[in-house]
């Protein structure tokens, strides 16, 4: 993904404020609530029977933190997202059989979470930069499918 200097600054400045544990759990939790069919990949996480159960589930929170840690890896490797996510792409494609559109959904949910937590900093320009990034990450994660 190609981000201009200003876009890189916008993304990294906001990322520096992110609490990975808190926002990761919220992003993954929202994905599971808003798109309930994605829960089938997380049956081992226990109770996902309601929005409250999902959002309070410690396994959802822990896995969400792992997901956002991977987004942090993307920020360090903007010039090689496909390489950065090659193993995760293979895992999600070959073993988990995740619909690659779910990567786009997660990216869009992450943008909602960021806008909610950092509304003063989340200008249209910042949103556009983040949209570019999450689209690039989703494409890299879906690479094994192509």
From Swiss-Prot:
Could you tell me the keywords of this UniProt record? Acetylation, Heme, Iron, Metal-binding, Oxygen transport, Phosphoprotein, S-nitrosylation, Transport
Globin domain span: 2-146
Q: Which residues bind heme b?
A: 63, 92
* Top-level taxon: Eukaryota
Q: Name one GO cellular component term.
A: hemoglobin complex
Per the record, the similarity remark reads: Belongs to the globin family.
UniProt name for this protein: Hemoglobin subunit beta
Q: What is the lineage of its organism?
A: Eukaryota, Metazoa, Chordata, Craniata, Vertebrata
Name of the coding gene? HBB
């Amino acid at each position: 993904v190609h981000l201009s200097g200003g876009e890189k600054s916008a993304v990294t400045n906001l990322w520096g404020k992110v609490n990975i544990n808190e926002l990761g759990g919220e992003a993954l939790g929202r994905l599971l609530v808003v798109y309930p069919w994605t829960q089938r990949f997380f049956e081992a996480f226990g109770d996902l029977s309601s929005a409250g159960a999902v959002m309070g589930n410690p396994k959802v929170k822990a896995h969400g933190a792992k997901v956002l840690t991977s987004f942090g890896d993307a920020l360090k490797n903007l010039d090689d997202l496909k390489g950065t996510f090659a193993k995760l792409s293979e895992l999600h494609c070959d073993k988990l059989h995740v619909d690659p559109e779910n990567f786009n959904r997660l990216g869009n949910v992450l943008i909602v979470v960021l806008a909610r937590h950092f509304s003063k900093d989340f200008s249209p320009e910042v949103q556009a930069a983040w949209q570019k990034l999450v689209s690039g990450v989703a494409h890299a994660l879906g690479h094994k499918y192509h």
